[in-house]
A protein has these predicted regions:
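Recognition helix of helix-turn-helix DNA-binding domains
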Residues: 184-219
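Acidic catalytic/metal-coordinating carboxylates
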Residues: 53-56, 79-82
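Basic, Lys/Arg-enriched C-terminal extension of HTH/homeodomain DNA-binding domains
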Residues: 2-9, 56, 152, 206-234
């Protein structure tokens, strides 16, 4: 468990003009380092701690007392949405910004419904993260333009996930397995990607087929590929 923090165990008393404290949670050290370099250059912001997975993040959260969290959606073990839901049980109003590699709007919808205050793509983090952090610290919701446009288009056309009840019925982990199937990943590769056992992945696949009324693994793959294509071109 790799965690770092820069705080005392007692919550710091806010001072006039004090820098806003940010906890970065990402399983890639280079991403954490890059965000820290970017954030620590700002006169009003400072990274107070880092973690690479959910358990470590909760430990640092308890000791570092951040003003905002930046969380990667695709953490090893419990993912970013699982961590977000856990955080909301103890810190219902703490601002959380989700970083994601997924540009499918369903992930943004689920993150916001789970209590996220913002959602941006990792590839635009350098450009958008400072704006996003300041927006959510001011009480706003921030979603990157690309994702916002997709969500609006889905809402207007009625093709969005809110009206696609079968896909919407999938759990967060089932959706992740479904997406990886659509990208051509086999069961063993999915298990490795998500740090799950093959038996667990097979169980998720069975649940997905049941929820989507699919009779075979072939139908599951075809449906997943089609869904991925639709989301990418939306």
């Amino acid at each position: 468990m790799n965690v770092t923090h820069k705080s005392q165990s007692r919550a710091p008393q806010p001072q006039p003009g004090a820098k806003k404290r940010i906890l970065v949670v990402d399983d890639h050290p280079i991403v954490r380092q890059g965000l820290a370099l970017l954030i620590n250059r700002e006169p009003d912001l400072v990274v107070c701690g880092e973690a690479e997975e959910a358990t470590g993040a909760m430990h640092v959260l308890a000791s570092a007392h951040p003003d905002v969290l930046i969380v990667d959606i695709s953490l090893n073990g419990p993912d970013g949405l699982d961590l977000l839901k856990t955080i909301r049980t103890t810190h219902p109003v703490l601002p959380v910004l989700i970083l994601s590699m997924h540009d499918e709007s369903i992930y943004a919808e689920r993150a916001l419904r789970a209590g996220a205050n913002g959602y941006i793509m990792k590839q635009e983090a350098t450009e958008k993260v400072l704006v996003a952090v300041r927006r959510i610290l001011s009480g706003e919701i921030y979603v990157s333009d690309r994702i916002a446009n997709k969500m609006l288009k889905h809402y207007i056309t009625g093709s969005g996930t809110l009206r696609n009840s079968s896909i919407a019925d999938l759990s967060d982990r089932e959706l992740e397995v479904f997406r990886l199937i659509g990208e051509g990943h086999g069961t063993r590769q999915i298990a490795e990607d998500l740090h799950l056992s093959i038996k667990t992945v097979e169980s998720y696949q069975a649940h997905i087929k049941e929820k989507l009324s699919l009779r075979s693994s072939r139908e599951l793959m075809q449906r997943a590929i089609q869904w991925n294509m639709n989301e990418k071109t939306a």
